[in-house]
């Protein structure tokens, strides 16, 4: 027995979306310091956020986000290594999805966010050498916490992994 719900969202292809690294480098001075520091270790994964520019504006938006991701360099490793790499990459942009309905941008220098817990389930074999679409949504935030869930699809539209995360989200005095 097998079924899949939901279907893969209809978003622009990864080739039509700007690389996050290119976007960050062009907007470096607008990014909060912790995120500037994080740029040094985000380079192993090519991440392309659909509608990235809106992530840096403080307008209220729906709590959904879509990113394409894959390894920057070819991985010849075993499946477990690909799964570990995807687990690592699945934290990118995840919790910030909970900020969107509140009009808080990741560029807000008083913002502090941290993961409380993060779970992942693999449904099918994955390859970090191929583009995967990560569809994220936040069903709840409150009490300085945000909850986010995600589905990861291969380019054939198969659901290959699911994620869930709760995190701390608060603004502090500078």
Question: Where do the PLM segments sit?
Answer:
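Terminal targeting signals and extreme-terminal segments of soluble enzymes
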Residues: 1-174
């Amino acid at each position: 027995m097998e079924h899949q719900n939901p279907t893969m969202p209809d978003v622009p292809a990864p080739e039509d979306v700007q690389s996050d690294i290119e976007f960050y480098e062009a907007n470096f001075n607008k990014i909060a310091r912790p995120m500037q520091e994080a740029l040094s270790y985000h380079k192993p994964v090519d991440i392309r956020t659909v509608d990235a520019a809106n992530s840096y504006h403080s307008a209220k938006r729906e709590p959904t986000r879509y990113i394409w991701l894959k390894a920057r360099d070819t991985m010849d490793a075993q499946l477990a290594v690909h799964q570990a790499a995807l687990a690592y990459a699945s934290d990118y942009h995840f919790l910030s999805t909970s900020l969107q309905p509140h009009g808080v941008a990741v560029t807000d220098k008083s913002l502090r966010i941290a993961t409380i817990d993060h779970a992942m389930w693999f449904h099918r074999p994955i390859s970090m050498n191929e583009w995967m679409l990560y569809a994220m949504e936040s069903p709840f935030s409150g009490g300085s916490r945000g909850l986010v869930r995600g589905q990861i699809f291969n380019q054939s539209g198969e659901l290959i992994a699911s994620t869930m995360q709760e995190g701390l989200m608060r603004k502090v005095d500078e």
